[in-house]
């Protein structure tokens, strides 16, 4: 017999009167035309900091095309194992003005090409055991803290520019001051409510040229930056740099 409590799975052997406790690391993947429908190229979404195994929120920033033949699906494993879900398998909510979801032959698609922050909420319930809500938000990335002059809010003056295509880089404004770099997304619903939670629950940095997400971990090692430098992020390749 197995039960899940929070982030742990407990397996009980009644016959031998033993038990085993194993930490569970729930995941979510996105596959579609933008990943060539190849699970080896699928985007692994980032878990919010306070997820549990049965309920949680996951996010990623990705570029997708518009309409038919540009669809995508999600799954909790990187495989065609029957757990994947598309247009009919989730509640779809757009928080982007003028952008709507469309049915691409059972796949999820949007009616305007571009960069989006995709947010998937997994909730225990429903006929299959889980319900899913797929959200889209504008892909807002912010500089927080010392390097923007000490601000700890969603300041539009400290928002990254968004590239025109899938190969481009998100670029920060020139940093205002020397200090520890803090980067995050902080998606808000159409009603202005925090979708994930506080900014640190969806923060990230980069090390050795690779974007590294905090996810469910603790404080990350610090990256120090100089005034005048800019941050460059490529969410397609996962590469990043500071110069």
Give a label for each model feature.
Residues 1-243:
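Insoluble glucan recognition modules
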